[in-house]
Each structure stands twice: as structure tokens, then as C-alpha cells.
């Protein structure tokens, strides 16, 4: 793993709320010496499973009703981040509040893993990389590497946790991705926003929605009249087989397309921005979404 893509930060801020479990999402004893804080609970869930009993892992954004794009950090978040020896930030313009908290609370030896920097992405690129199966695995490797850098005596333990997470905890996740890709590659789908693009591409689906429409919905900017007409027509004429929308960001434009899709008899699947329910592990959440998508594709195609 290229450690130069991750920033060894002198700043630290705090986040707190949810203590995530070890493999499978269950509870377990935590080591008070290594504090890990993730800005979002999808990365926090993964970190908790990789760290096991060797760290306390907390996530700042844990409420499924919270919009991470417009989140206002609290003093409690700052206190939580301040204690972090490993901080995990999404970056890519998604959680700009998090680096500010970290910079306000320096901690010698802290490692800040910024997912965007790891992946070579910048503000303006698609920030929803936890929906990219390949990039999820790169983040898994980076978290495991950083845990080992902080606690080298536990290197063998962290390697074992990483192997178990990849081969056991994520087994159903990987199997569903391969199954959907094999059965439904090339099926035309529409989607409300850019959150679905990385997963849809990995599944081999034909993404018909204009990327400018999806980006505008994700960023809360105005959708062009031309894009509205295109997306409406795709639903009305059943040019898409399935419609996928982010249930945490239902704008009037999304509501309109939802209604058009239902009227046209197009199966609908939902995704969410963060773990939903918040008690789910990363893999439970993703598997549930993949299963819903697979059912929608099966209804649409009869396969």
C-alpha cells in the first residue's frame, strides 16, 4: 500500500458516538490505548472489524437521517476527534468539516487516512467510493496497514483480522456482486444520484441517467431542463428496466421520477448514504441493498 498517499497529520479532533464491533458487527472488549475515529460510519464499521479488540472505534455521522454533505460538526465531535490516533476521513469534498476539526486538535503521531488522497481523487470527483467494491478493498488494506504502523506488535493480529474480513465477513457481498454482474450485465437502469454510479459500473449495468443529473441531485444544485426531460422520458417510455434512488435525498425532481417509474411499472430499488439501520455492519447494509437491487432486476427481466 502506498503510504505516501495518506497524510500523517499533526491535527486531531474528536468524534464520538457509536462503538463499532469486531468482525460481523458484534460487541467486544476494546483496547483503550488506540483510539480510531471515522468521520462516517461506513468507514468506521470496517475499521472496527479490522481493529477487533485492539482499539476503540467511533464514528461521527451515525444517524441515517443526517446528510454528510451539509453536516455541522459539534463540540462533542471535536473532542472525539482530538483523541484519535487514527482518523479516517472520506475527503473528495464530502466531509470538509472533518479536516478542520483535526487541524484544530493536533496530536503527535496521529495518522489521518483520507480516502480521496489514497485513491487519487479530488473535490469534484465522485465522493461515494464506499460504493466501489474495488476501492473498498483498497481502503481495507490501508486501514489495516495504518493500524499496524500504530501498533506494530499487533501486526499478526491485524493481518488475521484483514484476511477474515475479506474472506468471511465480505463473502456474501462479493458473491452477490459477481452473481448480479453475471446475470444482469448490460441491463439498463436509471438512478437518482451519483452515489450509485460506482456500484452500478462494478455490476456491469448500463447506466442511462445523464451523469449531470445525478451529480446535480447529489450536490443539491439545479437540474437542467434538458436533463429533467431526458430522465422523465426514460421512465415514461420504460427505457430503463429499474430505477434506483437514494432514500436519504429525495428532492422534488427525484419524487417526480419515482412517481413516473411507479406509473410505468418499473421496479424500484433504494440505496442510502450511510448505514441504515445504523446498527448494521458495512457488509449487512451493502448485502441488503444488493439483494433489493437483485430482486428488482429479476422482476424487470424475468431472469
Predicted feature locations:
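N-terminal export signals
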Residues: 9-23
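Extracytoplasmic metal-acquisition and chelation regions
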Residues: 2, 22-303
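N-terminal export leaders
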Residues: 3-9
Amino acid at each position: 500500500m502506498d503510504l505516501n498517499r495518506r497524510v500523517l497529520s499533526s491535527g486531531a479532533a474528536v468524534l464520538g458516538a457509536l462503538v463499532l464491533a469486531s468482525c460481523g458487527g458484534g460487541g467486544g472488549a476494546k483496547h483503550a490505548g488506540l483510539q480510531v475515529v471515522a468521520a462516517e460510519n461506513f468507514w468506521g464499521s470496517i475499521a472496527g472489524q479490522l481493529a477487533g479488540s485492539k482499539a476503540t472505534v467511533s464514528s461521527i455521522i451515525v444517524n441515517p437521517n443526517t446528510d454528510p454533505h451539509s453536516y455541522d460538526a459539534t463540540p462533542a465531535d471535536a473532542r472525539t476527534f482530538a483523541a484519535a490516533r487514527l482518523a479516517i476521513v472520506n475527503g473528495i469534498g464530502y466531509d470538509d468539516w472533518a479536516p478542520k476539526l483535526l487541524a484544530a486538535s493536533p496530536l503527535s503521531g496521529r495518522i489521518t487516512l483520507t480516502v480521496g488522497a489514497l485513491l487519487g481523487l479530488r473535490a469534484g470527483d465522485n465522493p461515494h467510493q464506499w460504493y466501489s467494491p474495488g476501492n473498498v478493498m483498497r481502503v481495507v488494506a490501508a486501514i489495516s496497514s495504518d493500524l499496524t504502523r500504530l501498533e506494530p506488535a499487533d501486526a499478526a493480529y491485524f493481518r488475521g483480522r484483514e484476511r477474515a474480513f475479506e474472506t468471511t465477513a465480505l463473502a456474501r457481498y462479493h458473491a452477490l456482486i459477481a452473481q448480479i454482474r453475471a446475470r444482469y450485465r448490460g441491463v439498463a437502469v436509471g438512478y437518482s444520484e451519483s452515489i450509485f454510479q460506482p456500484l452500478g459500473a462494478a455490476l456491469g449495468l448500463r447506466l442511462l441517467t445523464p451523469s449531470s443529473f445525478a451529480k446535480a441531485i447529489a450536490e443539491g444544485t439545479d437540474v437542467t431542463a434538458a436533463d429533467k426531460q431526458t430522465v422523465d422520458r426514460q421512465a415514461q417510455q420504460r427505457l430503463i428496466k429499474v430505477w434506483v434512488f437514494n432514500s436519504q435525498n429525495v428532492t422534488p425532481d427525484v419524487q417526480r421520477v419515482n412517481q413516473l417509474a411507479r406509473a410505468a411499472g418499473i421496479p424500484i430499488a433504494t440505496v442510502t448514504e450511510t448505514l441504515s439501520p445504523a446498527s448494521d455492519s458495512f457488509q449487512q447494509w451493502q448485502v441488503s441493498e444488493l439483494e433489493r437491487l437483485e430482486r428488482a432486476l429479476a422482476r424487470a427481466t424475468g431472469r
